[in-house]
Amino acid sequence: MHKLDSIAENVKECQKCELCETRTKAVPGKGNFDADVIFVGEAPGKNEDIHGEPFVGAAGKRLDMILEDTGIDRQDVYITNIVKCRPPKNRVPSKKEEESCNDFINQEIEIINPKIICVMGNTAYGTLLDGKEITKNHGKIVEKDGRKFF
């Protein structure tokens, strides 16, 4: 079993925070285990919660269009979220919920070792880049711990 498959199983069994009580399905990352690019969002939405896969709803359709427009195949990237379970009513995840999932996202990044991490949204940006201002760095490549974030 690949290490990322093991992480996915741990995500599905996780009970580190109260989101395990309200989720339909936990949503582990999915994609190419040797990806040069990782996309990291905030948390699963309604469709993701139903299907147990990241970015299959409206945001996923938009991401698919962007990938297609840039000539990137979705099968060549890895897609995940900071928080692996849907917060009720799609609210912003709490710090406790983010911290409960930190090991998962850190392990995913460590194992894949991508060339660039595309950070989507304030929650992902704040978690991965220690709360640095997203507006100040929007559209720029930021380096941290030898990794490139966009």
Residue positions per predicted region:
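A polyanion-binding, active-site-adjacent surface
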Residues: 1-150
